[in-house]
């Protein structure tokens, strides 16, 4: 297993639309293992392949007690079951140190493949529903900061760009 570098906002590669996985094979299973290792090291509760510059529809989630075991979603699709929404404070490994309230559908159905290529369907609730939607946004080139005002998004962008410049200067 290997730690993968996580892309950070405003890196334009985060806006890439992920392609469906054609075949769940050893290459994809190795990617999944590397993504879990990277997510745990960060530490985080979810990671999309887009965040590690692999533009295929793969995401991993581990909410500890809430999910009982780590979850893998390959080629996920989502169906919104009703119009009820709730707000949740979200953060992101690609937008480190920033948290904002995001409104998302409360009742959803997700269809995906597991790490063995077997289809499954779930109707997640609570944090799992939020996390699945957040990670699926990454596969579509969208970030949680896209849900906040343009002024807030620009402020976050400027702060992260400043942090990147300072980090580059301290290395050089």
Curated annotation (Swiss-Prot):
It catalyses: N-terminal N-formyl-L-methionyl-[peptide] + H2O = N-terminal L-methionyl-[peptide] + formate. Keywords: Hydrolase, Iron, Metal-binding, Protein biosynthesis. Its cofactor is Fe(2+). One of its GO terms (biological process) is co-translational protein modification. Binds 1 Fe(2+) ion. Removes the formyl group from the N-terminal Met of newly synthesized proteins. Requires at least a dipeptide for an efficient rate of reaction. N-terminal L-methionine is a prerequisite for activity but the enzyme has broad specificity at other positions. GO terms for molecular function: metal ion binding; peptide deformylase activity. Gene3D superfamilies: Peptide deformylase. Transmembrane segments: none annotated. Its EC number is 3.5.1.88. The active site is at residue 135. This is Peptide deformylase. Fe cation binds at residues 92, 134, 138. It comes from the Bacteria. It is an enzyme of class 3 (hydrolase).
